[in-house]
Structures are given as C-alpha cells and as structure tokens.
Amino acid sequence: LDNARQDLPLAAVLTSPFGNLTPAEMAEIRTAYPNLPFYEAVRAYAEEGGDSGNEGMAAGRAFTGESGRESDSGRDRALWRKLERFFDQMAHFRAKVPYTPVHELLAEIIETTGFGLSVAAMPAGAQRAANVDMLVEKASAFEGTSYKGLFNFVRYIGQLRKYDVDY
C-alpha cells in the first residue's frame, strides 16, 4: 500500500494469501513482459484480461507493453481474475490510507482478506496470530506519537527490525 513499485514487497504480497499467485504464475508475468519493471509487467499482464470498467484495474491502464502472447487459456483467465481481485483490494485500501489510522487500516485488511485466519492455520499459527495482533497494537501505539501515516509507520517498523527490537 505504501509503494507498489517496490519489487520485493510487491512480489511478497502477490505470493502471499493476499495475492495467492504461484511461482509459475509469477514466472508467466515476468516472461510475458521481460523488459518492463515488475510492477508495470504485473499491470500490463492484468490489463490483457481486465475489464475496462473496473475501477481498480483502470488505475493502471497506462502500461501497454507487448507480450507477444495470443493465448486466452483458462490458466490465463484464472491469473487475470487473481490480479483483478488483488488490484481491486489495493485500490480500496490505498484510497483509505490518507484518512484512516494505521491500526484501523491493518485491522480491516486482516479481517476482510482473511489474513488472520490464514496465519492461524499455518504451522505455529497461535504464535503467528499473536505476532499479527502485536503489529496492530504497535500501530495503535504509533498513532499516539507525533508521527502519523502509513509511510512513517513502515519506517518505524523498519527501524525496530534494524535494531532487532523485540516487538
């Protein structure tokens, strides 16, 4: 949400339960648009099968790289649907960033995407769920400081990680 053009965070989110893309699907996107930055490649791939009336997809219509792909297979359609759902969610949450406290935004993301349930179902799920809850608590405490906003919160968490602070 902070900056979709960062390749590693974007790839991590796309392969997480949020995007639910497989390694093969990620490779399909990259090979379809090898000369575009990854964010633009994802957008261009999604636009191949996107609905022009879709608000989330319409935000990325500027990218028109050539993939040389003629296929409209079921696999492509499934990937397009995943990307459409992902970009719709991103557009929804990004629209809320300027006026929603970080802890409320995190809580909504966790609840509406099913991320909390997904984390709880993983090995050591109870500990993982506790870590997610702690992140929301840290966001709430952060909102009480003089700093505000998602960008500053991401930097704050980065500093905690950098100095190996147990949060």
Where are the model-predicted features located?
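Conserved helicase C-terminal RecA-like lobe
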Residues: 1-167
